[in-house]
Amino acid sequence: TNYKKKIKQLEDDLLFRLSNSQGNLLDDVELIEVLNNTKITAQEVNEKLANASETNAKITEACEEYRPVAHRATLIYFLIAEFASVNVMYQTSLKQFNEIYELAIDDAEPAQMPAKRIVNIIEHMTYSVYLYIQRGLFERHKLTFALMMTNKILISAKQLSPDNVNVFLKGGGSLDIKSVRKKPKEWIPDKCWLDINALQKTAAFSDILDSFDRNEPMWKKWYDLEAPEQVNVPDFEDRITKFEKMMIVKAMREDRTQVAAQAYIGDAIGQRFVESVPINVEATWEETTPYIPVICLLSAGSDPTKLIEELAKKKKLKLSGVSMGQGQEIIARKLIQTAVKKGEWVILQNTHLGLNYMAEIEVYLTKAEELHDDFRLWITAEPHPQFPIGLLQMSIKLTNEAPVGMRAGLRNSYAWVTQDMMDAVPRYEWRQLLFTMCYLHSIVQERRKFGPIGWNIQYEFNASDLGACVQFLQNHITEMDMKKLNSPTWPTVTYMISSIQYGGRITDGFDELLMDTYAGKYFNQNALTKGIELFPGYRVPDSTDVTDFRADIEALPLTESPEIFGLHPNADLTFRTLAVSQMVSTIVDTMPKSGGGGGGKSPEEIVNAICADLLSKVPEPFVPEIAKEMLKKLPGGPTQPLTVHLRQEIDRLNIIIILATKTLKNLQLAIAGTLALAGDLVDALDKLFNAAIPASWLKKSWESATIGTWFQGLLMRHKQLDKWLREGRPKAYWLTGFFNPQGFLTAMKQEVNRQHAKDKWALDDVVMTSQVTHPPKDVEQLKDGMSEGVYVYGLFLEGCRWDGKQNKLVDSDPKKLYTPLPVLEVTGVLQKDKVTKGVYEAPTYRVKKRTGLNFISTFPLRTEDPPSKWVMRGVALLCSVD
């Protein structure tokens, strides 16, 4: 531009002289000199312009050459932005990202060849950003982030099909088991078979159904392996990618998906992306400035305060702190005012309890002009939706989750136990019970990871519960010593531990029973036996020195079997499957709501096809007038309790059928452009695209994992009610098919009570009892219904299985999480006649989620083992396992 301006200036000057020249131009020496200078300068400028143009072309070429770096950076930044929807605390600003990006370019390994330099920058930048982000993620989200990043990188490089990602995430969720090819063998779970049918639609697995027909024994052998992801996939190993192998692992052995995902990530972008990176508070501090605070995200059992205190001590800097809460803002302001002047550190703890002050901190750090170079601000907070986003985006995030496992739990407890505490009571019973109490505390905490089979509700048991129990035990043993007693008062001990201290947090009745069972197991006379093993390999140390206890704890296994909690080894499968389910849900929830679908189709086209398919299957609603007349013709008339129940079920199912039909038709109209796509229709479009159930349907119906299983349930419910209405009472009832199963059981009791009118039974004295048909029967084997009571079917046992030959509960088979219960005889008896010995009262729930709203009743099942065994196993009956 400067060169062009210079030429223009010379031209203007020359024209000016020419226009103002007088006489003969050739006699004007000065004009001729200007003309020569202009010519020479113009030549020089043109040469420089040519050089500049050539240089510009080279720069443009170099820019294009380095475009893959910018492309990778863009891809990762948008992933980070999407991932903030997983947890509001995962905010990262564009400014932060650019700083990491520029630093990564500077730090990447140099290379002579531009192509190699570009590869070095991309790899270094990708890993640098990954390290920066993952240290601020909770453990459960780290693999998810790495998997999403790997998928995006491979899709961008055309090495992975978005269609395959969709199939991996959604599986056979939109399929119906009755509309796909029949399973070759019964050992294949329905869910697995639906997922396999979904795989068949991809290019790599187009012949997988034929493979199962040909090589079913090989597939069975692969399915039964402990780690199938490490072994060749039958028929497919040589022709599938690591991602496709992960797809088949998820379809067949969902519990091994995360291990397969690690192998896929390691193969695609490097093993370092799946290796655990230990927390480094000092390295984090080195990245901060007085204007960039560190936010430590808190989780159960984690507190980074000690690490920060140790670093401050190492750096010889004063650290002041305050735990936020009502009225603590004044103290915090004073601490910060002093620290910014003197160059000290401040830690604000539990700031989720002082969000207004956090907004003030954001403004202060944004507008502050001069802060002491040594000043640093540390913040600890639990995730909170109202936490200031601006403060999150200017901060470095850090997580420091507590180690998991029995050894880690006992280690934490004995980091708190001191030698003075050990010496507080000069009796070995005190040290025995102190260790046992710490052991029980770890048991109840670690059991939470198994989901509903662990605790129905996830309780926040913490150090204060342990501390209260330890204080009680110390007082109790001291009193025992003073009174010269030989042993503690065990009923008092178990009551205080299970009902008062830990029980104060427990709100579910079956969780209370579990806590009582644990307390009774560990706190009895056997607990005073020196050297007792609380579980094989977990011996109570016989010592008076706290260091011996700590040494024994360090020698314990790093991981433990579910059996230590009283659970079946299969519970590990439950734990891993739950983790996979959460990972997949997280990925689906972060996916953009629009974009390409499978086979190049848009989401609207895919949903339109789903709507058409469902509308072709949806049953007609019952006609109220016709149903009313048919109810009158049923035995006993329309006032019989079970007939009243039938009428109520028909009314509720009609609401669902009408709602579903209306939603599907309106969606088709909206997709066609003749109806506005708004409100519930937007949600329905999104949910159906992801093989999920629209929220408006869930509000009025039942829980289900996918739209396929939900719709199958709708058809089966309609079939049961329609057959009952047309043909009279069925021989057996599918309990899962009722909106109100409690009402059904109550109606059954009322009818039994009426049958005993001559015996003058009072309805309040009638209770429900049950027994499994012996020999066990399927519905097809029943000839008639029960004369008194009802046959019920469709229930599944979780945590054990039913042995038909021995007619009792027994342990589950390996890898069988749920087993069908044979037909159950359910009737009513007087309270005084109910059998209570030799039975386990199995709680029964609608779905796997064992909340109070899903609880139906308890069914007594015969057992030769103590019922406490099944309580600790978490045994329950489920109406639906999807």
What residue spans do the PLM features occupy?
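Long C-terminal appendages of very large multidomain proteins
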Residues: 133, 192, 199, 213-214, ...
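A short helix-turn-beta junction within AAA+ P-loop NTPase domains corresponding to the substrate/partner-engaging
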Residues: 387-405
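Conserved catalytic/switch belt of AAA+ P-loop NTPases
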Residues: 313-321, 334-341, 345, 350-379, ...
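Extended, compositionally biased accessory segments flanking or bridging domains
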Residues: 91-341, 543, 549-552, 559, ...
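Proline-directed phosphorylation-rich, low-complexity intrinsically disordered regulatory regions
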Residues: 31-127, 677, 681-748, 754
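A short beta-strand-to-loop transition that corresponds to the Sensor-1 phosphate-sensing loop
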Residues: 298-301, 350-352, 379-384, 401-403
